[in-house]
């Protein structure tokens, strides 16, 4: 036990308040392979030294409280306390620092994202000594990640189930998201799938409302995808949203989907909660269902640059909790997403091993070992003119989801789906032939539109759209 980190319990109990940094700021600490490491962006209140602010975060998210308590002497704080082991100034920002905190593995319940977040971010964000606090990244040690099942199936198993290789998968969110009857909803699904899409999708807020109860929607969508499969010879799917007000109701909906023989269900993992999500992911693996994850509510948590939590942390948490797809921004389109940062967390979702790279916002090297990967889903204000950029940015292991970019086609849903499928196949072929999608993308789409009237019509409709 190193002298600078040892907590003296043998000298007798002394009541009162002492500076956190005396116990929790340990710049000489060498991190262990089993530690969970966190990088916090800390903005202290005026007059609060950064060392005290970083130590306060370590204390309040592990063993500490606001005053010395006599029961500290009944345990080994040196074994269980979080430690702020390094602080660096954020370049270009006034009074802002990155505080690195190491947490001993024994602080966390095995296989529980819920417990991990309750400990690390559950209480400390309202701390008075801090003006703002943001969790930028976590390093999940192998010894902890191996206690999680992770995604129900992963990328390779999904491709094998669908028998689709060598290209991104194509999807579409059914619009209008609310108000359609179940039969009309199923008709929209059928038109999109027969036109060439791989998936259609319930919107995140489609659950079981008076205008369309969940069982009716499930039945009509199952009929639609079976009919489209028979016509096209391709395996099709519709993300049936199983999110519900209780875990029991959610599981009932997932069981119904399994009985209908559909390949995939869906969950809103932030509004539904990590406990519910992990339960559903376990059910999906045991019963051969793929699991699509929507990140509704994420911007409430991750959009502010100096407070909250970066989406890369939510992405890592989802991979641990379980999901085969997750929405990950687009870089292009209507929703915010910076290219390098987006690609950083896309790699954290898909790859087995990701090197530390601060230029992409990756603060720690992450080794997922054997945990399956998650397909990133690009959606939000995208259309056929974005296809070359999306194909280049996201690569084959992704889902490109065009809602309005399919259903807004002037000739209807099926021609909209045809336009997207033709554009995608043209981009993949051009890439495989060695053409530069970033430089020649528009020309590739124009060439393809010469032999696809559906694509030509789509190009005309969205030629002036700028997000």
Curated annotation (Swiss-Prot):
Gene3D superfamilies: Ribulose bisphosphate carboxylase, large subunit, C-terminal domain, RuBisCO large subunit, N-terminal domain. Its main location: plastid. InterPro entries: RuBisCO, RuBisCo_large_chain_AS, RuBisCO_lsu_C, RuBisCO_lsu_C_sf, RuBisCO_lsu_fd_N, RuBisCO_lsu_N_sf, RuBisCO_lsuI. The modification N-acetylproline is found at residue 3. Substrate binds at residues 123, 173, 177, 295, 327, 379. The keyword Disulfide bond applies. It is found in: Plastid, Chloroplast. GO terms for cellular component: chloroplast. Residues 1-2 form a propeptide. Its cofactor is Mg(2+). Belongs to the RuBisCO large chain family. Type I subfamily. The basic functional RuBisCO is composed of a large chain homodimer in a 'head-to-tail' conformation. In form I RuBisCO this homodimer is arranged in a barrel-like tetramer with the small subunits forming a tetrameric 'cap' on each end of the 'barrel'. This is Ribulose bisphosphate carboxylase large chain. It comes from Phoenix reclinata (Senegal date palm). The gene is rbcL.
